[in-house]
């Protein structure tokens, strides 16, 4: 069958997404991969770093993620396929031909069948490993305008123009496509269906989705549902500049309630934790700076209406925008902006190596215990850094490549991420998937002071065999006290260690949360 995947991965609520670029993931000499930076890298089992720790696809299986999000893998213009010996690097947000794999990731770009076959081999290998494949799609603009396939087909039709007939530029890349025009809409729907039917792709991440109109995104969702409703669709609920189209008709974050079955990234949660994206030196909750707490609570609840989330205290929104929690992607970092390690260093110049590890773990614990769909950037699980580069779209491998020696030096961090992913997978309370259930079972607990957030998932939430789960996040450098309902609790996460078998017993009504860490208990 087209999607021979275990039901676990196809369950919307269980999704855990891992975002990667082909070169980043395997090009480094430490990867032990033969087909470095290629589609085929993801078909190689048994690859290891010099300390015999797993890399490549086996690393993904070990980590436990359910979906891999591949940065642009359709044919893009910014890497010359005839000069691959130059090792030039680009993320690939420069569309040339939408419906064919890019040749720079194939072993032979001159043989047309090679890229097709190798892309399919990659998808097949990931499917066999129980991992689904998400494509990053960039229908919002093309690399060229005058020379583009669209402009050559019907000049002036596929792109939006301003009143003065110059090109609109919602993408910030020179043009923006007109998804509301019937033939552009038809092109997008058919392109998505082609990747599903021909290449067995399981999901799509829409770049600058806020440039597309609501109706088109609903049409795409409808067409995809007819093939396989478990295929995921999410995107960036914003644009680079204001698109030339009525704002209330665009697939922006604030309108996502009108696009059921489509999710968007929560910059509220991200920046409530890390600080404003526009000022890398400015921290927030993780840096011990008060004020981000409500934005984080907004994210924990899944961007839905919740009686304890006061939206007037949330950083970027005055109202809940998601109808259902699965319409929110929770994350602290992605390919854009600083990776987590660099962000922590930028906002806390005096941070010690130990604090870096503690806050790194704390950040992802918030992400993976939130009701949205968790998303991590490749390499975060072994504390990758990009030397402080915040827009590495064409930076060399020296900046972008994952150094797999870090799996050895940061083995403890990797184990924490792996156990965090497993905790979420094993416990339905963390992924209720239904707004009514979240309002009923998720209760924020009162705390004293700032830089402390606590909540309870009560009464066997979503059929969880744990009756009550207490989760607390303390970003202060010192221990914090928390009052919890009386009872005998088993500790499963404390002081940077996770073990579902239990780390001891704790009795209410008062518990202590060590500084810069998360505490998770259940009864």
What spans do the regions from the language model cover?
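Single conserved hydrophobic/aromatic residue that forms the stacking wall/gate
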Residues: 2-9, 13
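Hydrophobic faces of well-ordered beta-strands that scaffold small-molecule active sites
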Residues: 16-18, 68, 133-135, 204, ...
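Substrate-binding/active-site clefts of carbohydrate-active enzymes
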Residues: 23-199, 209-228, 232, 244
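Conserved alpha/beta catalytic core and glycan-binding cleft of carbohydrate-active enzymes
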Residues: 221-222, 226-383, 389, 393, ...
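Catalytic cores of secreted or luminal carbohydrate-active enzymes
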Residues: 408-437
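Surface-exposed beta-strand/loop patches in extracellular or lumenal glycoproteins
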Residues: 475-487
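Solvent-exposed beta-hairpin/edge-strand motifs
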Residues: 485-499
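C-terminal beta-strand-rich structural cap/linker in extracellular carbohydrate-active enzymes
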Residues: 503-523
